[in-house]
Each structure stands twice: as C-alpha cells, then as structure tokens.
Amino acid sequence: MSSSLYLINPIEKSSENITGETNLLEHFNLYKTLNEFNSKHLSSTYKSYVKNLPGDNYIKREKSKHSSSSSSNNNNNSNNNNNSNNTNASGQQDVNMGVPPQQQQQQQQQQQQQQPQQPQQPEPPKPPGGLTRLVEGNFFDENQQELILLSLDDSQLRSAFTLLDGGYQRPDKDKKRDKKHRDKKKRKHRDGSSSSSTSGEKKKSKKDRPDGSHHHSNSNNNNSGNSMNSNNMNNNNLNHNNNNNMNHNNMNHNNNMNHNNNMNNNMNNNNNNNNNNNNNNNNNNMNNNNNGGNITVEH
C-alpha cells in the first residue's frame, strides 16, 4: 500500500463554481491552514496512527477481492468472445461449403451491414465501500462542508485534530473518590532523607527539646493527672456510698434500740401502774378493816 493513502488530498479552490463556501474559505484563509496541517502534522502523527489500525487488513482483503473479481470477469469475457468467434466461423464454413466465392463475399457484406457496429463500452467502476471509501475515496460528504465552514484559528484546528496520546484518562468519579485520602499524615522520610543520617545524631535531652516536646509531655502529665483525679473521685464515691450505708445501718440500729427502750419503759410503766393499783387495793382493804373495827352498837 502506498503512503499516499494515508494523506488527505489538498483542498484546492474550484475556479468553476464560486459559491459562498469558497468565499468563506478565502476570508478565513482556511486553504493555507488546512494544507499546512495536512502536509506537516498528518504526515507524522496521523500516518503512523492509521498504519497500526486493525482495519488495514480489512482494506487489503477488500482490495484483493475487487482485483480477483475484475480479473475473473476479464477472463470470462475473453473466453466468451473466443467461443463466439469459433462458432461463427464454423457456421459460416458449413453454410458456405457449396457457394461460389463471389456470393460468399456478398453475404458477408450483407451480414456486416445488418449488424451495426457496437463500440465496446468499459464497465463503470464500482464505488468503493467500507474503510476504503474513507481512506481512498474522494467523496465529499455534506457534513464535511459544514466542518470547513467553521471559523477556527490555526491553534484551534490543531487542537481539534490532535490525537490524544496521554494514555489512560481517569474519570471524574475516581478523582472525587481520591480526594478523601489526600489529608492523610505524611510518613517519615518521605522526601528521600535516609534514616541512617538521623540515627548518628545523639538523642536530645528534655532541656534541648523544642517547646512542642514539653507540651507533649505536659499533655501526657495532664492526662495522667486527670486519670488520677477520676480515680480519686471514684474512691470518694465509694467512701460516700459506704458511709451512707453505715449511717443508714446505724440509724436503723438506733431506731431499734429506741423502740426496744420504749417498749421496756412502757412495760415498766405498766408494772408501776399495776403496783400502784395493788397498793391502792391494799389501802382500801386496810381502810375497810379499820372501819370494821370501829363499828359501834347503838342501843
């Protein structure tokens, strides 16, 4: 395959039909820019790109089919012509066996006059189809005219026809997903500084450390103090609960003691009352006895 197949034909101004399209092309100077684009840019990128397309094999197969079919048609036509000539010659020989030569010449002239001369017309070429139409054909589509009518600058045309060889382009979804991981903390020695250089240095004492280290230790101490305070508070709560329970038990014990004392006092009071009652009864008996002794008999 020739290398000219991969190059777009130069755009030339048609002198016969001057229409609005040609005036626009002249106005925006697109003839020059497009021709330069075809000669410079496409010769390097587009040509190498199209050569590696999988459709090249298809174009070759399609070409071989056309060539084989045309050669077979030519062979068939030649064979048919030879057969017809042979049959005509043999038929004329059979008919002209018992005819004098003058009459044979007259008959041949009459046959030539009856059969008008038919010039051999070549078969019209079939328009190419498939990928060959895109690569080899000089057919201009209506959409192509609309593309040419666009008022584009040279840089815009180049960017429009430039092949993107940047490799895989990440979609926006992946970019949004990766934004979450950007705020991670940086690892040590990320910028190439080796750990061996820092290992030789002596460890800094607490006095030599920057303020941030003191702050870090203070924060640890504060955290430990907070934890101790929380433990003390828990202990206080336990003591408070224990004291409350002990006080509550003491109060119950005191109440029981008071209740028992009151019961005993009541019992004692009742006993005292009973004793008083007994004493009163004894006094009454004694009074009765006295009264009985003082009885006088009246005459």
Curated annotation (Swiss-Prot):
One example of a Gene Ontology biological process annotation: positive regulation of transcription by RNA polymerase II
Chain residue ranges for the region called Disordered: 60-133, 166-299
Biased composition (Pro residues): 119-128
GO cellular component, one term: nucleus
Coiled-coil segments on the chain, per record: 260-291
Compartment(s) of residence: Nucleus
Biased composition (Basic residues): 176-190
Origin superkingdom: Eukaryota
Annotated family: Belongs to the Mediator complex subunit 19 family.
Protein name: Putative mediator of RNA polymerase II transcription subunit 19
Gene name for this UniProt entry: med19
